[in-house]
Amino acid sequence: MDIKNSHTLTKAIEEVAPFCAGWALTDKVGDIRRMAQARFRSLMYKEFDIPKRSEGTRRITAPTGKLKDIQRCISAIVAPYYRTPECVHGFAEGRSVATNARNHTGRNYVLNIDLKNFFPTITYTRVMMSLQELGFNEEVSDIISRLCTIPMWDEQKQMFRNALPQGSPASPLLSNIVCTSLDQRLSALAQRYGVTYSRYADDMTFSSDHSVYAKDSKFLKELENIVESSGFKINEKKTRLQKKGSRQEVTGLIVGEKVNTYRQFTKNLRTA
């Protein structure tokens, strides 16, 4: 279906809704336009904390009711327009933390980098521009971006900005789409330096048998410049360079000559 405006977007949502959410729109265009207004969207979210993989908690802002279903439908509609790059392993069919980690087995050096405040950094404007680059027109990009973002407090700018909530069924796909240029540029950088690059959501990993990771190295300076010019910031506290012989970890899995979970790693130690 050629999605040109709110009417054709609503029609597309209506067609996929029985498969994604088990219902059909009742008010159709009215439902979509009403939920696209910030004052209505803000009332249709719930917040709660979940434990992080390492320590502390992560705040989840999850849509409820019809808005959640509409976001699920939007993800299904937009997905065919996005071709997942080889370097992306998060929120991609047939890929996982295991396929991500497998790229970095048996390497002398493994560098882990975390993107700070990943989802809140991806604003309405960035989503809209990325959807237009994907081929959607301004009207459709605007509606999708408003339906899938929520006002969030930006500590750095000291203001509210519409951004992707961590907990929306549409946020994973939309975040990958926004990261298209970042992934392309980092893949090209990695290729120039003979390094392997992969990304799982906000976790970026670089690995190689030779070192390009010395402090203030040209590689690290170029990497930081690409990240910041792409609208993200590196979380310095979570940056880790792991050398061969130490426990090298990628997205929660141990990588040596093969990928192991923590339980498998402990079992291997006991039987060694």
Stretches with model-predicted labels:
Residues M1-D49:
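Non-catalytic, polymerase-adjacent accessory regions of viral genome-replication enzymes
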Residues G22-I32, I77-V78, Y82-P85, R126-L131, ...:
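N-terminal low-complexity, intrinsically disordered segments
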Residues K46-Q71, H89-A92, P151-S175:
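Short, conserved non-catalytic motifs in the polymerase core
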Residues K52-S54, D209, E257-K258:
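Short acidic-glycine loop/turn motifs at beta-strand connectors
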Residues L67-N117:
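Active-site-proximal segment of RNA-dependent polymerases
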Residues I74, S171, G252:
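A residue-level signal for conserved active-site and pocket-lining positions in enzyme catalytic cores
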Residues N103-A201, T205-K243:
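Conserved polymerase palm-domain catalytic core
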Residues I226-A272:
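A conserved non-catalytic segment of reverse transcriptases
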